[in-house]
Regions:
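A short beta-strand element within the Helicase C-terminal
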Residues: 400-413, 422, 438-441
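Conserved helix/coil segment N-terminal to the catalytic DExD/H
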Residues: 178-209, 220-221, 225-229, 395
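Conserved helicase ATPase core of P-loop NTP-dependent helicases/translocases
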Residues: 158, 172-183, 351-352, 362-397
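Walker A/P-loop
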Residues: 119-143
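Post-DEXD/H (motif II) to motif III coupling segment of the RecA-like Helicase ATP-binding lobe
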Residues: 217-284, 461
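Conserved segment of the helicase C-terminal RecA-like domain
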Residues: 426-455
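Conserved interdomain hinge at the start of the Helicase C-terminal
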Residues: 304-345, 352-355
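Conserved SF2 helicase motif VI
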Residues: 126, 247, 415-435
Length: 465
């Protein structure tokens, strides 16, 4: 048996034990098939040829190919047999350039960075507000090799580059984003959407360290999954790291994140290191339930009596009396001098709430997907100019760092655990003279679905991650 470790792991003349390991661990139930099956859409499954399983390994002739991150998973097979192991690069050792660190790290950050560097890869799980970006930057600094930092939003890209340049101004950091491809001497920060659509072969051997910010997206929405996996499969970097606060999914696709980035040192599909939330210096938000007492309109139900989630969101978003309850509470918080963020599921709901707040004399800012980058940066960097930001869950959950925020209004019943936890984390940042952070959760108590989702949110907020 011969194993070559490059952009992927290539195993020639593989054993039955290795094949069994791949079949067991790298065959994942297709979440799309699972959803359609659950709601009785067998005809769609057949018509669209949707497979029940997704395999993240392949066999061609006598060669078994695995994602690079599976190395620790198959290490026991490498040790147990006489194997010809080949690395297609000559340098797999850490070579710090002796650039002194300029970051005053907390003890929990030092421990996390040390563990990740010694592991030479894997997933770091660290709570919102714990300084994941700082940890990623210091991992790169400790290894001292050319890096590629992958992110999926323009906000995260700009924030990361600004943070790196402020800490290490002597580094030549390139950018790969829409309308700009500049390969820096020391590394690059790249938007995954851009990098996935250029010829990666031109510089695939240039980078030796990859850091995937918010790496849960490696196993998230299908479009992003394909982009991340194409890049990770193409670049033979010896050090691949992932950063996330919420390594959870309701299905088994999370295994793909570990397979492509790195299993733990004991070969399990779990984080390489997990920061204890009790060690993190943040302010813990209170969680207050606001009862919404209105009766349900049964027209939002499906014919079988079940809820249609999107009809439900439309219904409660357009309920003016319900909105007035939320607006009254926002005004009360404004009189207390709070810095608030109001989250809605629908852009139209955001626009309605923003307009109503302005009519009440509240200094409100609307930040949605179509908000231009320059305007968004102005809002996020000037909290003294506003009382309230109105935005969507999707936009706030990643890439927003306004330490002054202390109040969160959950206007609609968000059901995704990761989204809720990340949004709560946005108001728990430490800031001088900050008020006690508080989450207002508006719950339609006469709609059983909404009450159940509130209980789930409360449990997830209490546990954090």
């Amino acid at each position: 048996m011969e194993i070559t470790i490059s952009n992927k792991i290539y195993i020639k003349d593989f054993s039955n034990d290795l094949l069994n390991w791949a079949e067991k661990n790298l065959t994942i139930v297709n979440p799309k098939w699972q959803t359609l099956k659950r709601i009785g859409k067998e005809e769609t499954i057949i018509r669209c040829h949707i497979p029940e399983y997704i395999k993240i390994y392949s066999i061609k002739g006598k060669t078994l190919t695995l994602p690079f991150g599976c190395l620790y998973g198959i290490w026991k097979f490498i040790k147990s047999e006489k194997i010809d192991l080949k690395l297609n690069d000559s340098d797999y050792e850490i070579s710090n350039k002796n650039i002194p660190t300029r970051i005053e790290l907390y003890d929990y950050q030092k421990e996390a960075i040390n563990n990740m560097v010694l592991s030479k890869g894997g997933v770091l799980v660290s709570p919102c507000g714990s300084g994941k970006t700082v940890c990623g930057i210091e991992i790169i600094h400790s290894i001292g090799k050319r890096f590629l930092w992958l992110t999926h939003t323009g906000d995260l890209l700009r924030q990361t580059r600004s943070r790196m340049k402020s800490l290490y101004p002597e580094l030549d950091i390139g950018l790969i984003t829409e309308g700009e491809i500049h390969i820096g001497k020391d590394g690059c920060i790249a938007a995954v959407q851009t990098l996935a659509n250029v010829d990666i072969d031109e510089f695939k051997d240039y980078f030796e360290v990859i850091v995937v910010d918010e790496c849960a997206h490696v196993s998230g929405a299908p479009t992003l999954v394909k982009m991340f996996q194409k890049i990770l499969d193409s670049i033979p970097a010896r050090y691949k790291y992932g950063l996330t606060a919420t390594p959870t999914r309701s299905d088994t696709m999370i295994k793909a994140m570990y397979a492509y980035i790195g299993l733990s040192k004991n070969g399990e599909f779990e984080p390489t290191y997990k920061v204890n939330k009790d060690n993190v210096k943040t302010m813990v938000a209170l969680h207050e339930k606001i009862d919404i007492p209105f009766d349900i309109d049964f027209s939002i139900l499906n014919s079988d009596g079940t809820f249609d989630y999107y009809n439900l969101i439309n219904y409660i978003s357009n309920n003016s009396k319900r909105n007035d309850i939320i607006l009254d509470n926002i005004c009360k918080c404004q009189q207390e001098g709070r810095k608030q963020v109001v989250l809605c599921q629908l852009v139209s709901h955001c626009e309605t709430m923003h307009k109503k707040l302005l009519e009440r004399g509240i200094k409100s800012e609307l930040v949605i997907g179509k908000t231009k980058n320059k305007e968004r940066e102005r809002v996020l960097n000037s909290p003294e100019e506003w009382d309230v930001i109105v935005s969507t869950y999707k936009l706030l959950k990643e890439g927003v760092d306004v330490k002054a925020l202390d109040t969160l209004h959950l206007c609609t019943p968000q059901k995704d655990k990761a989204t809720v936890v990340q949004c709560v984390g946005r108001i728990e940042r430490l800031c001088e003279n900050k008020k006690q952070p508080i989450v207002y959760d508006y719950v339609d108590i006469k709609i059983p679905y909404c009450e159940r989702k509130y209980i789930e949110r409360k449990r997830n907020i209490d546990k954090r991650y």
